[in-house]
Amino acid sequence: MGPAEPGRRAEREHRAEREREPGNRAGPGHGPERSVLVRTPATSANLGPGFDSLGLALSLYDDVEVALTGDGVSIEVDGEGAEVADRGERHLIVKVLRRTFDALDDLAAAGPGQPAGQPKGIRLRCRNRIPHSRGLGSSSAAIVAGIVAARALHPHGDLMDDDAALRLATDIEGHPDNVAPCLAGGLTIAWTTPDGARLVRLEPQVRQVVAFVPEQRLATERARGLLPETVPHADAAANAGRAALLVAALRDGLGDAVLLDATEDRLHQNYRAPAMPESAELVERLRSAGVPAVISGAGPTVLAFTNASRVDSMAARVGNGWHEHPLDVATRGACVVPGEPGRRS
């Protein structure tokens, strides 16, 4: 952090407060309304042994139209989570959009550009398909949507590169395992350094999965609270080997027998099982039938590395109470959908 940054941050925060006062906004939105449509994929993190590191982008998408308007915040939500979604400044996409505008203003002020200030008004039209609080990265999708929209709409959006976007998304989310595949698509290995999060993207040969989504929800914070502060050395060593094997198995398509071994976990799934006993039981039933299956993220969704036809033949083993989602690995991460009306070229 340079010596001028604290003062610049204080000035920015003071400016943001003034801009949000009625009749005193001075940011984008004076001219014709500008909007973008952003599409973000669902993600599955951990994948068994890759705790807080491995992530996979999936072909289930949220769409949000983000528009800079004359004044106020207007939010329309259709689909998953509509009944509980915030409709004002507390909406996650709005908060992330504003934070990204601040970050871009800092970059502009440090270079040849002029800060844009906060948008005068924001309108969101959300079409949510990713189940909320089920371990499929719905919050990461919202965070990434806000960042992608801000980069597209801010006059100096090109000053934030993909690495900086990952660092910002991780700073907001708290860990990179979902935001990384949401941004990059495919299979990602993410880690943190003193300078922020980083990722490596791979194109997996394993392309099909089935997500079993229950009705119950489970907050990530509750799932994390069940984890012990320390684990046996043998368990840590076993997970390290399995995580390395899993990357090779997914990347090279080594088959179900190897994938079944590669998805073994000793660090988190057993500790979290009391909060989602039905999910833990389904994982065991599938694995006993030779299907590589894991808890998706913090749960309670179960992710099986298989195709829909194989699962259909095992309907009795799966049981009732699950919504089956046959999905492909999404090779592309979050993006602005081209050709939408109002998009800034």
Where are the regions that the model predicts?
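ATP-binding N-lobe of GHMP and related small-molecule kinases
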Residues: G2-E5, R9, R15-R134, A152, ...
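Short beta-strand segments
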Residues: R39-P41, A57, C182-G185, W191, ...
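DPxDG-like acidic metal-binding loop motif
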Residues: L60, L136-D162, L183-G185
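Alpha/beta catalytic cores of group-transfer enzymes, especially the acyltransferase/condensing modules
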Residues: M160-R207, A280, R285-L286, A293-I295, ...
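Short beta-strand-to-loop capping motifs
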Residues: T192, P214, A304-A308
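Active-site rim beta-loop-alpha module in soluble metabolic enzymes
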Residues: A211-P274
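Glycine-rich, charge-dense phosphate/pyrophosphate-binding loop(s)
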Residues: L250-S345
